[in-house]
Amino acid sequence: MINSKTKLLGLIGHPVEHSLSPTMHNEAIKDKDLNYVYLAFDVESENLKDVVNGAKAIGWKGFNITIPHKIEIMKYLDKIDNDAKLIGAVNTVKIENNKAIGYNTDGIGARLSIEEIIGEVKDYNILVIGAGGSSRAVCCELAKNNNLTIINRTVEKAEIIANDLSNKLNNAVYYGGLNHNYNMANFDIIINTTSLGMYPNVDNKPPISMQNIKKDAVVMDLIYNPKETLFLKEAKEKGCATINGLGMLIYQGAKSFEIWTGVKPDINIMKNAIIDIL
């Protein structure tokens, strides 16, 4: 029940009307019997600074940041977590002692989603398709303990991420273009971070051949609408374990929830809340 002691959490983005986050977080709040509420706010870029200052002034506990504000928000924060600095984007802000502190939980969300299937993600050969914002978050997390190759239509974008991570993590990260004929048997985990195959363009997929993919490979697509992309269907036909983007969405949200409240939410509660409305 909302009262004068209810703590405020939220989502800042533009647009936000189709977001699954309020449903997911409010179910987790209800399950843990916490006096919080999570709301979505459609905010234009020119109002971001005012939102951060206002959130501190009225005592918000924190908020998520989504498209298109994940980079711009950084200039208005008092402190930024090291992983978020490496990624170059923030998706979670905690308000503490009148300070706005930025985090990025996207990469952690991807890793935990994969670990549901195979356990600890360490010492694997991983192929990441795409070099956008989501790719950077995933790569920053997975490059710490794995052998990473990033491929992208514009090779220079993949090169930038690979060089950044190689320099900052002291771990070689490889890169290439989409027109190369890659031996898929070399990879244990393959992740599509592009929008190819997302609704309504469900007949699209990354131009990657599954011909000699390992049967015990794990194939992940960050897309969750549709729940099974053409990319995942082809991988499943080859005997691979497949993961859509729902797990990443849930786990990144769960990590944000824990950062704000100090409480670990029930993953299944969050998952069922989303499945019920999809």
Swiss-Prot record:
User: What does this chain do?
Assistant: Involved in the biosynthesis of the chorismate, which leads to the biosynthesis of aromatic amino acids. Catalyzes the reversible NADPH linked reduction of 3-dehydroshikimate (DHSA) to yield shikimate (SA).
Look up the EC number in the record and give it: 1.1.1.25
Q: Which Gene3D superfamilies match?
A: Leucine Dehydrogenase, chain A, domain 1, NAD(P)-binding Rossmann-like Domain
The alphabetized UniProt keywords are:
Amino-acid biosynthesis, Aromatic amino acid biosynthesis, NADP, Oxidoreductase
One annotated GO molecular function is: shikimate 3-dehydrogenase (NADP+) activity
**A Gene Ontology biological process annotation?**
chorismate biosynthetic process
Q: What is this protein called?
A: Shikimate dehydrogenase (NADP(+))
Pathway membership, UniProt: Metabolic intermediate biosynthesis; chorismate biosynthesis; chorismate from D-erythrose 4-phosphate and phosphoenolpyruvate: step 4/7
